[in-house]
Swiss-Prot record:
InterPro entries: Ntn_hydrolases_N, Proteasome_sua/b, Proteasome_suB-type. It is found in: Cytoplasm; Nucleus. PANTHER family: METALLOPROTEASE TLDD, PROTEASOME SUBUNIT BETA TYPE-1. Non-catalytic component of the proteasome which degrades poly-ubiquitinated proteins in the cytoplasm and in the nucleus. It is essential for the regulated turnover of proteins and for the removal of misfolded proteins. The proteasome is a multicatalytic proteinase complex that is characterized by its ability to cleave peptides with Arg, Phe, Tyr, Leu, and Glu adjacent to the leaving group at neutral or slightly basic pH. It has an ATP-dependent proteolytic activity. SUPFAM superfamilies: N-terminal nucleophile aminohydrolases (Ntn hydrolases). The lineage of its organism: Eukaryota, Fungi, Fungi incertae sedis, Microsporidia, Unikaryonidae. This is Probable proteasome subunit beta type-6. GO terms for cellular component: cytoplasm; nucleus; proteasome core complex, beta-subunit complex. GO terms for biological process: proteolysis involved in protein catabolic process. Keywords: Cytoplasm, Nucleus, Proteasome. The keyword Nucleus applies. Signal peptide: none annotated. Belongs to the peptidase T1B family. It holds the Pfam family Proteasome.
Length: 290
């Protein structure tokens, strides 16, 4: 038999490997596995014609396990390094309409993961005669706002735009990015002939007219409250009464104070806009800043 650096060659051309480390297949394999071609202690025995095949079976199983473990590890690494273009800057917004006015409110915290980026970032944008709010990825919301302003200015070269046309325009802007959607939950508010309208959207442009809506990280806590006090969805034989402007503001402030106690992304300040036809009044209230 001829000596070889990697193993020992037999006359039949086969190779008897002593250990996996000796063959240098797996440098990070910490446990040395002695190779026993016949399964006999010491590796001695009569080699038959299928001795090499029978001897490789245990090694093949070991290699298979190692390859399987390697694939599982690589899959986990791929999951960690997967491309994710979105970030949840979140916060909370509320829009509700009553009689001849609309209340639009939102907190001013801009956060990402465990970092506070800003304590004075408004989530309420004025687009012509309308108010636009958005939660989710702030950069996407701002891009939607910029596109809305641009398209409305082009439209109003000939004639002024009404709330219904603006609502359809916003839907088209969101739907145009349906294959790589804006991560933004928008609400558009405005008036048409003295009547208030609030339109709520999902990220791909589906929308509908609502009486009250809450979006963002505090939605699960605030929306049931609005459904009860504004829409009276869980009341029996409730009369359809309109709340006054002061009662609506008081309700919104209490709702945000409660959400700020439990939601880390809804903090710092509360910006409240009371919108009437051709008039917008703004007011700021303090929230928890921790």
């Amino acid at each position: 038999m001829l000596s070889n650096k990697r193993g020992i060659h037999s006359a039949s051309g086969g190779i008897d490997l002593r250990t996996l480390r000796e063959y240098c297949l797996f440098e990070d394999f910490d446990v040395c596995m002695p190779f026993n071609p016949m399964g006999v202690p010491g590796g001695k025995g009569n080699r038959g014609s299928d001795g090499a095949i029978r001897g490789m079976l245990p090694l093949g199983d070991a290699m298979g396990d190692l390859f399987t473990a390697g694939k599982a590890g690589s899959t986990k690494m791929e999951d960690k390094e997967r491309f994710d273009p979105y970030e949840d800057n979140s916060g909370t917004t509320i829009c509700l309409k009553q009689g001849d006015f609309i209340v639009v409110a939102g907190d001013t915290r801009h956060s990402s993961s465990m970092v506070i980026n800003s304590r004075e970032m408004s989530k309420i944008f004025q687009v012509g005669d309308f108010l636009l709010t958005g939660t989710g990825f702030y950069a996407d919301t701002h891009e939607v706002y910029v596109k809305m302003v641009y398209e409305i200015r082009q439209y109003e070269v000939d004639d002024s735009i009404n709330i219904h046309s603006a609502a359809n325009l916003l839907s088209k802007i969101l739907y145009s990015k349906r294959f790589f959607p804006y991560y933004s939950f928008c609400v558009l508010s405005g008036f048409e002939k003295g009547k208030p309208y609030v339109y709520s959207y999902d990220p791909i442009g589906s929308f509908g007219s609502v009486t009250c809506v809450c979006s963002g990280s505090g939605r699960s806590m605030i929306q049931p409250l609005l459904d009860s006090f504004i829409d009276k969805k869980n009341w029996n034989n409730a009369e359809e009464t309109q709340l006054s402007q002061e009662d609506c503001i008081r309700l919104v402030v209490k709702a945000f104070n409660s959400a700020a106690e439990r939601d880390v992304k809804t903090k710092d300040n509360l910006e409240v806009c009371v919108m009437r036809e051709n008039q917008v009044m703004r007011e700021t209230f303090p929230l928890r800043r921790d």
